[in-house]
Amino acid sequence: YDRVLTMGQDTLLVLGRPDEPLLQMLLEAASDLRVVVGDRMEEMAPAAPDATLILSWSATRELLRDVLAVTPHLRWLHIMSAGINHLLSPELAATPALLTNGRGAFSSSLGEWVMGAILYFAKDFRRLIRVQGEGRWEPCDVTEVKGQTVGIVGYGDIGREVGTRAHAFGMHVLGLTRRGPATPPPGDPAEAIFGPAERLDMIARCDYVVVTAPLTPETRGLMGAAEFAAMRPDAVLINIGRGPVVDEQALIAALSQG
């Protein structure tokens, strides 16, 4: 498609290449804007000085940094993802434009993904796929998730979506927040909400530990040696947050030690 797609008074730079169905939806929603789409600086450069809006669809840190340096009239920058750590730069920190992100937009989808991961381990899908590929059948033992316990580290929007689906499967749901302990509000899927001081106690109760916490200075390495030591030997760790929330070396050591 052409780089300049629609014409209007305000200019929207879309940093990335949306798939065609999503692109058409975007163009319909932005029909009164001049829309420029691309993933290279040379595509953005002609329109950047007049741009008032930026949609970071799948921009790299370098592309966003370079575009911000030449958009003096920018009023609004929206980043599609919930996390923005991968895009941080001095230019981003200094922009006076309104900055928004996709927080909450992916909660339902991630909740479904976590349940898929839980069932993957409970029903041993990896082995089933392997023997299917080998063209043979063999009996297998699987577990039910009903009655098992899932602990959610970072019990926010995404965590509650996970909890809602886990509760629907008959699982016991425990949440961990930095402001806990707290009494779950009426209708909440969690049976208990723990605070940082109780995190090891919560983790020790769990068949599945799901990490949904954002990456901050306080959460970097949140899941470390003490947390892995508290987990049951047969417990499963599922991390859908940022990688550095889990201390990778401590995880490797815990797995090596069985």
Annotate each predicted stretch with a short phrase.
Residues 1-98, 224:
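An N-terminal-biased, well-structured beta-alpha scaffold segment characteristic
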Residues 15, 151-154:
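Conserved N-terminal Rossmann-fold NAD(P)-binding element of oxidoreductases
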Residues 94-149, 157, 161-164, 168, ...:
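Phosphate-binding beta-alpha-beta segment of Rossmann-like dinucleotide-binding domains, i.e.
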